């Protein structure tokens, strides 16, 4: 694929789509949503599970994909999480200080209430571990009703309706490549 034009785009993933190139068991994959974006063969960077929504990056730039998905590159991710019941202050503090899951310790860099009823919280993490946000809350006895990734490695889904995508700006691409993001 040497010489192929590099393509970078971001999708606001809707619920019900699997983050996969081709899953024979899936009704719908995210690739259907970006199939008309370009002629180049692009791939999702990282994953959002079928029931999660929000920001998902696509590219054909293998070097950038390796950089962004490698565990040693810590990228800031912010999620808005809707829970089945109010998150107690004690549980929130525990998540901020750190909890131990089956694959090790995890803590939130920041966590805050989004709604007064305390069933919606914003959580900022740098970990790329599989289904980490859901597992944090499930470990604490909460069911996640909705999970929305609103920020990833300096990118936001601002002004992007659910199911829509856009190409990254030259500045966004340069920021990602240089690692100049939180």
Regions found by a protein language model. Give the residues of each.
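Basic, flexible Lys/Arg- and Gly-enriched helix-loop patches that mediate nucleic-acid binding at interfaces
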Residues: 1-182
């Amino acid at each position: 694929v040497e010489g192929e034009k590099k393509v970078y785009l971001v999708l606001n993933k809707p619920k019900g789509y699997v983050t996969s190139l081709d899953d024979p068991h899936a009704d719908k994959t995210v690739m259907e949503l970006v199939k008309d974006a370009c002629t180049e063969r692009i791939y999702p960077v990282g994953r959002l599970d079928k029931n999660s929504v929000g920001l998902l990056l696509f590219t054909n730039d293998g070097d950038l994909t390796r950089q962004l998905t490698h565990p040693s590159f810590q990228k800031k991710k912010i999620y808005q999480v809707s829970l089945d019941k109010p998150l107690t202050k004690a549980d929130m503090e525990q998540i901020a200080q750190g909890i131990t899951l089956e694959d090790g310790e995890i803590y939130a860099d920041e966590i805050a209430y989004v709604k007064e009823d305390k069933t919606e919280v914003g959580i900022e993490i740098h970990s790329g571990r599989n289904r980490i946000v859901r597992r944090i809350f499930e470990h604490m006895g909460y069911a996640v009703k909705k999970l929305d990734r609103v920020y990833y490695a300096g990118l936001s889904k601002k002004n992007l309706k659910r199911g829509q995508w856009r190409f990254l700006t030259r500045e966004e691409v340069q920021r990602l490549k240089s690692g100049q993001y939180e």
